[in-house]
Structures are given as C-alpha cells and as structure tokens.
C-alpha cells in the first residue's frame, strides 16, 4: 500500500516535471509562428463566388431550414477544410476569419495540438463515457481541473464551478450570489424555516425572496431567464419573454478615442457610479420597484451591445461601491476572457484592490463556468447542481488550449498585433479611406479586441458584405459597430491582409 507521503511526493514530482516542460516549451515559443502551427495555412483569401453565401451554401441552409431556424445563417462552413485563421465554406470560398465563431475559437481551426488530443485514450474515454460530474466524477477529475482551469485562476479566487455555456455560467453565478446573500442575512449556521421551505414551492417569499441583479444598458449576459433579465443589448432578444423586474443603470456615455477624451469620460463614469450606488441604496427602501440588489454583473468590455469601454478607475469604483453595500460583483468574461485583450483575463488590467466575487467564462475556453471562493459555495449540496456540471472532454480541450497559449506566448503576441492594428486603423480613419465612413475607434491597449463604428448602420452592414466578397469574414455588434474578433494565432501578416482589404472595401462604399 502506498503511503500518503509517497503519494504527495509523486504529485509534487509530477508538478515539477510539468513546470520544467512548460518552461522548455516557452523557450522555443519565441520562434514559433502561426505558419509553423499551421504549415498548410493559406497565404491569401480565395473567393470563387460573386456573393457569400454562394449557391451551395444557400442550398444547404435551405435544407436545414426545413426542420430548424436558418434565417440566422451567415454561410455554411466546411470545417474539415478550415485551417488556422482561415474558414472555408461549402462553395469553396476561403476567408480570413476575423469573427472566429463569435469570438469562440482561440488557437485556430484544426489546431494540431487539439487534433492530437482528440486521438488520445483519455479524450476518447471522456467523450464516450460522459460523466454526471456532480455525482459521479471520474478518477482524474481533480487533476484535470487543477491542470486546466486551476492554472489560470484569477487572483483571489480559489473555487471553480464548471458549467455548460456562458449563459448558464452567469445564471449559476446569479444563483450562488442569491444563496450567499440570504445566508449572510440569516447568519452562518441558521437553518431554513418551515415557512421558507413551504413558500418557495409556491414561488413566494420568504422562501423565494424578492432579490435582484443590477446590470447596465447595452449589456449582454445570455438568454436564459435570469441572464436574459440582465441582458439589455437588443429588444429582439427579449420580446415576449417574461423577465424579472431588475434594475438597470446607464453605461457611461464615453467618447472615442478613449484616451483623447479622458476628462469627459471620467465625468461620465462618475455619473454612472453615482447611479449605481443610488440603485443599490434605493433597492433596500420600502416601496422600491425592485428587490434589494444582491449582485452587480458587468462585462470588462460590453461586446454584443456595441464594444463599449470604460476605464480601470470605473471598475475600481464599482468594486468600492459593491463592497460598501454588501453587493456581490460578478465579472462576465465570457467574451473577453482567454487572451484576446492582451491579458488572459481582461479584468486583471484593472488592478482592483480586492478581487471580484465571481468571474464567469466560456467561449474561447471551449468550456464554461465561474471562479469564486468557498464563502459563496451553497450551504447544502444539490442547491447549485445539474446532471452534467460541465464536460470532461471540453475540460481536456480547455487544458490543451491553455497550454498552447502559454507554450507559444500567444497573449503577448496578440497584444503586439493588436497595437499594430490599432495604429493602422487610427491612421486609416483620420487620414485615409475610412475618413467620413468609419469612426469611434476603440480598443487601444486591449489586444485585438478592437472595434469601430460605421458612420451609419447601413454603412457598417455594407462594409461587412464588401469585406466578405474580398475574402475577410467579420461581424457587427450594437447599433452600428464592427468588431474585430480574430484568434490568438492571428499575426501581423494576417493583419496586413485585413487592413489591405478594409482599405479596398472602404474605397468601394
């Protein structure tokens, strides 16, 4: 029988070995480029149809439309032929992908590291024997979580709740915050009362308390009932669906470029912070139209709502206000997380004096969940629970994505490429083909997480379609914004292709 000391020593040795291997790989990373990761990656777009979607794509989409919604389709993709930064469609068009499955692909299509993972016994076992993780975790679950999500824990957060998608990550963070808020009100060791137990079964208080989540205008946090109630980006997302009566505060009315308007932006943020505090304070007063605010949720950059920015000082102000009034702070890093902003977690750039209470993630991680601390773990089992509680196969994928990012210094490279693109776009808007057509460039010092507005929504939409015809796939957000969401393997050579095609497209408008 192996002693606990021997087991601990073996684990320590394994950890040391992994660290040494990682350091060795990082030394090699300085010479690794996307072309070495994807030796067969195209060097330029290849467009064979006059319109995208082309005829084959339209035909396949129409077939899908006979049994499910297809009006949201951009084009139908041939994923087997997509590689690296390039997406291939059913008609044989090959486009430089600046949208990356709505910001969800981190390290390129058909990345060889992920393809190798898919052939391993560990991945096959996890895929073919999907575990109900909350009740029957596999023998390697502890190690798998520690070597994946555990390696990129935000500072100050030591617990991990695994989930299925970004919406349910936020939804379960809401539930955790409500339970922790009520536990604090009751007292640490207080038990549920018979009245609470019976009233919750009728969806009535005190068992189902009238608590609320505070969010911002233009926010997007998902489409489940709780997350949709906190979402404020587009009416079409919310129409006909009953919602919780939760408070909303105006996002700071900032101006771009951000740095050139710092004084006005600081004033706008001050107004928004005052409104946040007023909403929290008034929620606890008799006669309030909504219940006490238990948590505030905020995106580091409002993505779906138009790529709206704020300063680190604003987010520090939110942390100060939430701490002052006993409100939990949830940072929604579903789209900003995993490197695109030039940091693994966008909120790490705020240098908060105390960490947020929850950080949610999904998209580029290819897995989902939230980080928190044991203080916000429910008092009893089965309170924040479902059958799957995540996915071991996707966790294996997340681990490899994290390792590839670290091994090849992809975040540092993304930061550098983002600065290059920003400078070129700034000149294009101020002095080049973009003058009078595109405006409000934003994302300085935010990696490749960049955006700009079309002069009108029509101009933005025309530009997206012209770029497609030229072989670059892009996406919009908000009322008239065009957002850049390339992968972390996007290099300066890809940026030059994008910038060249953008200049051409602008000249055709």
Curated annotation (Swiss-Prot):
NCBIfam families recorded for this chain? GABAtrns_euk
What protein does this entry describe? 4-aminobutyrate aminotransferase
Annotated GO biological processes are: gamma-aminobutyric acid catabolic process
Which InterPro entries would you find in this protein's record?
4NH2But_aminotransferase_euk, Aminotrans_3, Aminotrans_3_PPA_site, PyrdxlP-dep_Trfase, PyrdxlP-dep_Trfase_major, PyrdxlP-dep_Trfase_small
Its annotated compartments are:
Cytoplasm
Residues with PTM N6-(pyridoxal phosphate)lysine: 363
Q: Give residues annotated as binding substrate.
A: 223
In its UniProt entry, the species of origin is given as: Mycosarcoma maydis
UniProt keywords (A-Z) are:
Aminotransferase, Cytoplasm, Pyridoxal phosphate, Transferase
**Molecular function per GO:** 4-aminobutyrate:2-oxoglutarate transaminase activity; pyridoxal phosphate binding
Function in brief: Deaminates gamma-aminobutyric acid (GABA) to succinate-semialdehyde, which in turn is converted to succinate by the succinate semialdehyde dehydrogenase. Not required for the utilization of GABA as nitrogen source.
* Catalysed reactions, semicolon-separated: 4-aminobutanoate + 2-oxoglutarate = succinate semialdehyde + L-glutamate
Q: How does it assemble?
A: Homodimer.
What this protein needs as a cofactor is: pyridoxal 5'-phosphate
Q: Which family does it belong to?
A: Belongs to the class-III pyridoxal-phosphate-dependent aminotransferase family.
Q: SUPFAM superfamilies from the xrefs?
A: PLP-dependent transferases
| The enzyme's E.C. designation | 2.6.1.19
């Amino acid at each position: 029988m192996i002693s606990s000391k021997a087991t601990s020593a073996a684990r320590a040795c394994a950890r040391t070995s992994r660290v040494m291997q990682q350091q060795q790989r990082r030394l090699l990373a300085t010479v690794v480029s996307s072309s070495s990761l994807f030796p067969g990656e195209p060097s330029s777009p290849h467009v064979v149809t006059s319109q995208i979607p082309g005829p084959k794509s339209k035909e396949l989409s129409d077939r899908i439309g006979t049994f499910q919604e297809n009006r949201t389709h951009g084009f139908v993709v041939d994923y087997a032929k997509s590689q690296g930064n390039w997406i291939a469609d059913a008609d044989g068009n090959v486009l430089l992908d600046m949208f990356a499955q709505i910001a969800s692909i981190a390290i390129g299509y058909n990345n060889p590291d992920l393809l190798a993972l898919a052939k391993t016994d560990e991945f096959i076992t996890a895929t073919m024997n999907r575990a109900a993780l909350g009740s029957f975790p596999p023998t390697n679950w502890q190690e798998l979580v520690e070597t994946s999500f555990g390696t990129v824990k935000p500072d100050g957060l030591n617990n991990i709740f695994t989930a299925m998608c970004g919406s349910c990550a936020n939804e379960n963070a809401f539930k955790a915050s409500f339970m922790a808020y009520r536990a604090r009100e009751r007292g640490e060791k207080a038990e549920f009362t018979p009245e609470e137990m019976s009233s919750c079964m009728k969806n009535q208080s005190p068992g189902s308390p009238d608590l609320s989540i505070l969010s911002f205008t233009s926010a997007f946090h998902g489409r489940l009932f709780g997350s949709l109630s906190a979402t404020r980006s587009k009416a079409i997302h919310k129409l006909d669906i009953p919602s919780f009566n939760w408070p909303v505060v105006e996002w700071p009315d900032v101006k771009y470029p951000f740095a050139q308007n710092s004084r006005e932006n600081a004033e706008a943020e001050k107004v928004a912070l005052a409104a946040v505090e007023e909403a929290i304070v008034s929620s606890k007063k008799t006669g309030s139209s909504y219940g006490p605010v238990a948590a505030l949720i905020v995106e580091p950059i409002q993505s779906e709502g138009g790529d709206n920015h704020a300063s680190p000082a604003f987010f520090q102000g939110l942390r100060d206000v939430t701490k002052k009034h006993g409100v939990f702070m949830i940072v929604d890093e579903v789209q900003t997380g995993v490197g695109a902003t030039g940091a693994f977690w966008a909120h790490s750039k705020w240098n908060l004096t105390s960490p947020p209470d929850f950080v949610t993630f999904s998209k580029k991680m290819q897995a989902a969940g939230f980080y928190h601390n044991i203080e916000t773990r429910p008092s009893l089992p089965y309170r924040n629970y479902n059958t799957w509680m995540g996915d071991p196969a996707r966790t294996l994928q997340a681990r490899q994505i994290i390792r590839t990012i670290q091994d090849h210094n992809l975040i540092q490279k993304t930061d550098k490429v983002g600065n290059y693109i920003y400078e070129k776009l700034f000149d294009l808007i101020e002095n080049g083909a973009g003058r009078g057509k595109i405006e409000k460039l934003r994302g300085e010092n935010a990696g490749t997480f960049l955006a700009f507005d079309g002069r009108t929504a029509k101009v933005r939409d025309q530009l997206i379609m012209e770029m497609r015809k030229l072989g670059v796939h892009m996406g919009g957000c908000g009322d008239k914004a065009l957002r850049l969401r390339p992968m972390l393997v996007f290099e300066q050579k890809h940026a030059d292709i994008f910038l060249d095609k953008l200049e051409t497209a602008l000249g055709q408008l």
